[in-house]
Amino acid sequence: MTNDGSSEQSKVAKVLGFFGVPVLAQSAAQFRHNFVADEISSKVRLFCSSDIFWRLLEDIERSPVGIQQWQEQVHSAFIYAGSDVDALRKLARKLTGDKEATLNDMNRSARDMLVSDGVVGFCGVMAGVSLTPSDANVDHSFLLYSSTRVATNIISIGQGAVFSKLEYQGITVFFSTTKEIIDLDAKISTGVFDVRDHVLSAVPIVSYIRWAFTEHWHAPEINASLVVDDPVLKQSYGFLNFQEFLSLMRRHRFSTNVAFIPWNWRRSSPAVVRLFRENPEAYSISVHGCDHTSAEFGSSDRQLLCWKAKQALARMDLHESRTGVHHDRVMVFPQGVFSEAAMSVLKQTDLIATVNNDTISVDLHPLAITTSDVWDIAVMRYSDFPIFTRRYPWEGIENFAFDALLGKPAIIVIHHDFCGDGCLKLIDFVDRMNTLRGRLNWRSLGEVVSRSCRQRELLAGVMEVEMYGTELRVQNPSGQPKHFVIRKREHDPSAIKCIHAGSRQLSWKFSGSQIDFELELKSYESTTVRIKFHEIGLDGRSEENLSYKIRTMMRRYLSEVRDNYCIRHMPSFVSRHFKVN
């Protein structure tokens, strides 16, 4: 329910739309009319402010019929703080049954918030997570204190609750004491979403939608991978010893992808190659640029970018042929730098996706990135080619947990120097990741990408799936045949060469800003869908003259001197003077 011009209800509608939930916005008067007239066809999930909800309860309680209709027609309600603090206080006391219940202003010295698992399955991966909110979270928020046992605190600070599960006349009411609802259209200047800045405006409503609507978009599984940037495949690289690291992976249940610089394709150690080849469930490699020179994929020159991409993939193919180590066709940008042109070019290669920390291009006038963009499984703003986002461990377990709540894969990035304490910080972090609610599936980076999608059941035996990378693993885990309707965002259908499911070519259709195709899978059957794009032709031009080759070689060798010797023995000197990448 909404008042005319309510900005928060508009934000609620956007969040519901993001999860694919249909919305019927009504004024309080319209809802009360339909409610009294018994014109509500199915049980509703109600979203409104405390001001409106308080007035609704006053209307309901005017007759026994009103209470009966409430019980018969409402599934549950999500209530957030309105502008009338007195109405919020009265509502809190009514729902808790505690006439002495108090609402205190949150202050900027607020302690850690704890997300409870008191309502089984409600908070998903976030259950049990503790996080420290930023100052932005405490404005327009209150702490609810009540001595009754009616309330279940879902998000709390000490004994006070900021989000609670209550009841009214036998119907579950989720009660948030903040006035803010996350705005999915808000631009993110950094391109990175930090849940610590939006705990109260985001976690309650996302948790409720996932709990209340069985038909919402969701990820079929939570996948994870640790990515280590840059190492040459030799016995040791900086603080990283591949044999010892394998033992850690086995003991602590995780997998590692090496973002491998194609320039190093002839330099892998036979012993380490054998280690990777014999342990594909633990070790994998992806494509980390081409030469790893400064901003090599930040150019706007499409021919140069195409040449770089093709050279990188050719080198990776040579490395695979030479060593037998398969590589994931996923690009990890050196220094995180990319341009819009680079994304357009990479889409028309054999790469299936990109993985990056940054989501804003280095173009003079970059595209704006919104909250909705970074909440998605992958950022799809650049030529409909995905950027799967990754994070450093120091961004907090809470950010990885919230990503997983949204359905995003957990891609963790480190450099070898993060292992400088004998991997203690890393292992502590991985162990905490593995204790999150919901099983993490540690996979190669390519598997993480190809298994990342969101889906929902349209009808019995019919699944709608949205794919992001140009390769998707589709599975039917049920004992019955299942029909899959698959869609992918695409604004340039003329770029598509063909679509295959295994060896079978599929027909597809273009509709607005997406392509759609369908397939049938027998019980317990799986297949891999691949979208192939027309390649870009080269004009034969190359920037790789002798001077460039020498400078690139010096850059790579100096980087290894830094990582293998200087950082280990002269870390303070390196941090001040040695900036080769």
Regions found by a protein language model. Give the residues of each.
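A glycine-centered loop/beta-turn motif at secondary-structure junctions
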Residues: V15-F18, S42-K43, H75-S76, G118, ...
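Metal-dependent polysaccharide deacetylase catalytic core of the NodB/CE4 family, i.e.
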Residues: Q73, I79-R93, A101-R108, R253-L346, ...
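Catalytic grooves of carbohydrate-active enzymes
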Residues: W211-L240, S321-V332, G336-M343, T349, ...
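Helical hinge/lid and interdomain linker segments adjacent to catalytic or ligand-binding clefts
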Residues: S7-A87
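C-terminal domain-boundary segment and adjacent tail
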Residues: A25-S27, I205, I209-W211, H216-P220, ...
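Active-site beta->alpha N-cap acidic-glycine motif
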Residues: G191-E281, D328
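A glycine-rich, often tryptophan-bearing local segment used as a flexible ligand/cofactor-contacting loop or short
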Residues: L56-A127
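Alpha-helical scaffold elements lining the catalytic groove of polysaccharide deacetylases
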Residues: S236, T293-R322, H365-F402
